[in-house]
Amino acid sequence: MSCTFTALLRLGLTLSLWIPVLTGSLPKPILRVQPDSVVSRRTKVTFLCEETIGANEYRLYKDGKLYKTVTKNKQKPENKAEFSFSNVDLSNAGQYRCSYSTQYKSSGYSDLLELVVTGHYWTPSLLAQASPVVTSGGYVTLQCESWHNDHKFILTVEGPQKLSWTQDSQYNYSTRKYHALFSVGPVTPNQRWICRCYSYDRNRPYVWSPPSESVELLVSGNLQKPTIKAEPGSVITSKRAMTIWCQGNLDAEVYFLHNEKSQKTQSTQTLQEPGNKGKFFIPSVTLQHAGQYRCYCYGSAGWSQPSDTLELVVTGIYEYYEPRLSVLPSPVVTAGGNMTLHCASDFPYDKFILTKEDKKFGNSLDTEHISSSGQYRALFIIGPTTPTHTGAFRCYGYYKNAPQLWSVPSALQQILISGLSKKPSLLTHQGHILDPGMTLTLQCFSDINYDRFALHKVGGADIMQHSSQQTDTGFSVANFTLGYVSSSTGGQYRCYGAHNLSSEWSASSEPLDILITGQLPLTPSLSVQPNHTVHSGETVSLLCWSMDSVDTFILSKEGSAQQPLRLKSKSHDQQSQAEFSMSAVTSHLSGTYRCYGAQDSSFYLLSSASAPVELTVSGPIETSTPPPTMSMPLGGLHMYLKALIGVSVAFILFLFIFIFILLRRRHRGKFRKDVQKEKDLQLSSGAEEPITRKGELQKRPNPAAATQEESLYASVEDMQTEDGVELNSWTPPEEDPQGETYAQVKPSRLRKAGHVSPSVMSREQLNTEYEQAEEGQGANNQAAESGESQDVTYAQLCSRTLRQGAAASPLSQAGEAPEEPSVYATLAAARPEAVPKDMEQ
């Protein structure tokens, strides 16, 4: 009984499963499409019909009609079927359903699936009516418009929700376009809002136009705002490449760049992996890129706040209307002073703007029209100036309705703010006056270790800058090569020094004038009074004159490093002239002079040079007295001091050597005189036999005495050669009882006779003997007297005869020691010729 019940229960359950099939109640399938239900033409589309029973056959219906059938293989039962279309066309657009069947029954239809094929008609455009930027929870109005007379517009939002809105088109008579407005919102910050629009005909609702460009709504969230910057700068020339960087949080996935004047997102940068920097590269900047930019970033945490505003200016728009920039009174201004930058143009700009390098923007001013010149200008007054104003300035013109579109820039204007640090020196090695075609190099140097120097021509707009070089002497130097000179080279120059780490420049150097000759059609004349050759201390006048009208005359000395002299001309006898007077002249003013003429209207442009005039100043150089009318520049003064020190050192060294030699010579002369005196004493004490007055040698029983006598002669001759003193020995009268030997020594300087008498012989006896000698040589005495007036220094040592007394004293005959003979030396002021002839024997 129980078994029968169980069998009946199983049969009932089995029948319950078959009853829906038999009665047509199979579950309806599910129809899907890949990749999307809205596809463009020539896209591969696959329909998937899925069920749960295990059907034998699947059928695809389009617009209510059987479109395609797929029979399943019983060996490989599956619960789905694929219907593929490799290249869909407009004919494939429509409504699709699917169904399936088993061996016994067919299922019902799936839900309706619409396949839209795009790419027909005109492409519409989509814009945010005000801005794509919207706050969280807010609404934004998007406008879709097209030239084609479509009946409908549809707006779609990408994302899992597949939001869409449909509106009837309306004709806009002002734009002659068809359009529709869509209000999108509320916008939430937890997703991206990428919108597109299409147009279609109501009679063909599944054939759409191509999609518009996407507009992504930028939601202002709560995350930290990113930073934005432009490279190479926010002021960019048209057609140049540039990059805008946006840097945000580390988890940022997408960066957005928005031009605030644009009704759509400017650019989107999707990162391959989360990062904190987005790069927006613009290969060629155009007018459309000008404007104010902000950037946003989006990540897993949502949207960030907007960045600060970056104003991008495109220049070079008005290519042929370049403004002009100048500075008054000079591009070099002392710190604390004022300057005026003058921007002008012939083109009627509404505004001028002044910019400085390394700065975002400068000041802008409305233009004013100058009716007399027809120009439009603006005056930018800056002051009091500080070192921060040093740099390069430009000005641009623009219109009020396009403030980010500027003209081509003016020429660069350098501004230099000079301070109080030590001024450098400026010189030229080619001279102050140059002929056209000569090369000119100006040298700026200082004992301060400046890193760079600047050269400025007074009245000019340019400032040249060069890095300095260090010399072995500790100077910093920079050479400015101006090339071949012309009339434009003439002027006054100054230079300045600065350190790399400071924007402040030094005080100005002394001015240096550069004058160019041959610029006036005249040649002046130059004369000198009283003579071309004058004595030191006299007054000299150089007269420069011309028959042509000349405002100023310039006097130049050849080879001088000094600035040329200038004098206003005076009219005299229908000629222009100027007299350059120099009092108390010294030999420093000797040289060749030329003069030139100049007009006040062209101060640094000279006439041709006059004929050269040679001035010679005789007399000693008064080194303690500087030139009365010319001053030496710093460079020449350094050279002069070095030369003076060198000469002084050499002179002192020579003086020391001379004193040393003189002292050594005196010491040697004294030593020789002592030796000679000692030998004379030895000779007089050791001789036993006298020598006759006539020079006949008598018997010499003592050989040592003879040897000493020969030594004495040799010593006297040696003294003659070394000391330069003349020794004139002569024999006294025979009646001299003492038999003493006399030696006459002539001094080096001629004097009158009768200066020194011997210590033994009386002055009267010596004068008597000298008078007897003079009687035989009267002519020689006259020659001697005539030589007394000559200031000639000489010394001649002449050995004549050495006489020794022959007679022995009574004491010697008695055996007593003989008395030593005496050698007398007397100074006489007579020449050698004044000695009596009988004494020379």
From Swiss-Prot:
PTM: Phosphorylated on tyrosine residues by LYN. Phosphorylation at Tyr-794 and Tyr-824 by LYN is important for interaction with PTPN6/SHP-1 and PTPN11/SHP-2.
Glycan-linked positions: N338, N500
Known function: May act as receptor for class I MHC antigens. Becomes activated upon coligation of PIRB and immune receptors, such as FCGR2B and the B-cell receptor. Down-regulates antigen-induced B-cell activation by recruiting phosphatases to its immunoreceptor tyrosine-based inhibitor motifs (ITIM).
Assembly, per entry: Part of a complex consisting of SKAP2, FYB1 and PIRB. Interacts with PTPN6/SHP-1 and PTPN11/SHP-2, when phosphorylated by LYN at Tyr-794 and Tyr-824.
Written domain comment of the UniProt record: Contains 3 copies of a cytoplasmic motif that is referred to as the immunoreceptor tyrosine-based inhibitor motif (ITIM). This motif is involved in modulation of cellular responses. The phosphorylated ITIM motif can bind the SH2 domain of several SH2-containing phosphatases, including PTPN6/SHP-1, resulting in the dephosphorylation of the downstream protein kinases SYK and BTK.
Extra remark beyond the main annotation: Belongs to the leukocyte receptor cluster (LRC) present on chromosome 7.
Alphabetical list of SUPFAM superfamilies matching this protein: Immunoglobulin
Positions of modified residues (Phosphoserine): S684, S757
Motif annotated as ITIM motif 3, chain positions: 822-827
Domain named Ig-like C2-type: residues: 27-116, 118-220, 239-297, 308-428, 424-513, 537-618
Phosphotyrosine, modified sites: Y794, Y824
Endpoints of the signal sequence: 1-24
All ranges on the Extracellular side of the membrane: 25-642
Tissue: Detected in macrophages, splenocytes and B lymphocytes (at protein level). Detected in macrophages, mast cells, splenocytes, peritoneal cells and natural killer cells.
ITIM motif 2, short sequence motif: residues: 792-797
Disulfide-linked positions: C49-C98, C246-C295, C343-C395, C444-C495, C544-C595
GO CC, any one term: plasma membrane
Keyword match Cytoplasm: no
InterPro entries xref list: Ig-like_dom (IPR007110), Ig-like_dom_sf (IPR036179), Ig-like_fold (IPR013783), Ig-like_Receptors_ImmuneReg (IPR050412), Ig_sub (IPR003599), Ig_sub2 (IPR003598), Immunoglobulin_dom (IPR013151)
Keywords for this protein: Adaptive immunity, Cell membrane, Disulfide bond, Glycoprotein, Immunity, Immunoglobulin domain, Membrane, Phosphoprotein, Repeat, Signal, Transmembrane, Transmembrane helix
Name this polypeptide is given: Paired immunoglobulin-like receptor B
Motif (ITIM motif 1) on chain: 711-716
A Pfam family that the UniProt record links to this protein: ig
Topological domain spans for side Cytoplasmic: 664-841
GO BP terms in the entry: B cell homeostasis; B cell mediated immunity; cytokine-mediated signaling pathway; learning or memory; myeloid dendritic cell differentiation; negative regulation of protein metabolic process; positive regulation of long-term synaptic depression; regulation of long-term synaptic potentiation
